[in-house]
Swiss-Prot record:
Annotated positions of the Phosphoserine modification: 26
Protein name per the record: D-xylose-proton symporter-like 2
Modified residue annotations for N-acetylalanine: 2
Domain of life, source organism: Eukaryota
Compositionally skewed regions (Polar residues) per UniProt: 1-15
Protein family: Belongs to the major facilitator superfamily. Sugar transporter (TC 2.A.1.1) family.
Keyword hit for Acetylation: yes
Keywords linked to the UniProt accession: Acetylation, Membrane, Phosphoprotein, Sugar transport, Transmembrane, Transmembrane helix, Transport
UniProt entry tagged with the keyword Transferase: no
Amino acid sequence: MALDPEQQQPISSVSREFGKSSGEISPEREPLIKENHVPENYSVVAAILPFLFPALGGLLYGYEIGATSCATISLQSPSLSGISWYNLSSVDVGLVTSGSLYGALFGSIVAFTIADVIGRRKELILAALLYLVGALVTALAPTYSVLIIGRVIYGVSVGLAMHAAPMYIAETAPSPIRGQLVSLKEFFIVLGMVGGYGIGSLTVNVHSGWRYMYATSVPLAVIMGIGMWWLPASPRWLLLRVIQGKGNVENQREAAIKSLCCLRGPAFVDSAAEQVNEILAELTFVGEDKEVTFGELFQGKCLKALIIGGGLVLFQQITGQPSVLYYAPSILQTAGFSAAGDATRVSILLGLLKLIMTGVAVVVIDRLGRRPLLLGGVGGMVVSLFLLGSYYLFFSASPVVAVVALLLYVGCYQLSFGPIGWLMISEIFPLKLRGRGLSLAVLVNFGANALVTFAFSPLKELLGAGILFCGFGVICVLSLVFIFFIVPETKGLTLEEIEAKCL
């Protein structure tokens, strides 16, 4: 709603005092971005809940991946499925598996249109509601068609949660631990996968076990929804609305101060107002007072942010991650580590490895920085992919080569692309672009995931596994070049400093 002149006046005052209105950065303003920051006092305990409830969206996403791998087995059991339509074709099973992916693609498109209107908090509340509805519809499905509808609804919530959770965590976390907290969301995704595999292995031989697998999401969705209802709105989203002339200026500013006090704990109360003024100044300084149009998404620093964020999540998928994990059970079975009937236990083993390596990344990411982990981890992925390709081409009599390559790939991925891809897209976009830009990045992520997943089998038949994995290795080398020349280091910078210095 448009503001009257009295309401708009404080906006122009902020612009005159702290920044530019024409898009030109004057030299005398530079110290504002470089050094004159209010110390970020915060309570680690107070920072936990603003991370935990959004991260449950990632946990529910990961749980769905793990549980579905076991649910498809339960669904097709004549004696244990508890349904008359258990005789599913490969296409039917494929739709059960990929239904949430289609929903996530649609959810990313929805997020593009609503993110900056309703804000991160309300988007996460909506995601929790759809998680709840999707889980209930899936678990109680009387027919195959209803099951697919439930899977798609659940997928829409995945798209919304994977869009809003990184933004909310990045915008509310103190800068010194922002990298750790956003990366912990990836830890929660992997934790959810391990939980899904675990619940699945426990209920796969239970009558109607697939219903229990999907119903387990219900209490988690309720907790997420209640938690997000209790948490405040993102202070940076509130301040963006202030400088863009949306809503009552003083009310929004006071709400931002209260939000920061709630998010940072009692230690922050005395400096909250000063921190809000500093954020307002920096947002105006870097030109956030002008709302971005669709065309401007592909110009200037907005385009650079899209290239960095979109490129990272694209390489995250097209370097073979979905395919390698898909092929993992057969690799371990070939090596004699598991019988075919123990596929779920194999998945749990890999999930635990992913969990451990993600934990390592979380611990060191704000010490070592983003670029060293990306370059080192992706470098290890290059070695592992060529090693895996060589196994199928030259060393098929030595399955230990494949096992070493597989474990190296999983470990290096979780040190690099796994957590840092989501972290960088939550940091790199300017605030006025963050909602739409991150939705495009999430769309690229799920779209590339779908493309690689569906193209893997025909490409394997056409080229053979050895050449295919070597091809992924070549793409991985290209991603190293991209990271080295394009991706900036954001360690220790505030979100406003990232926009001013890196774009």
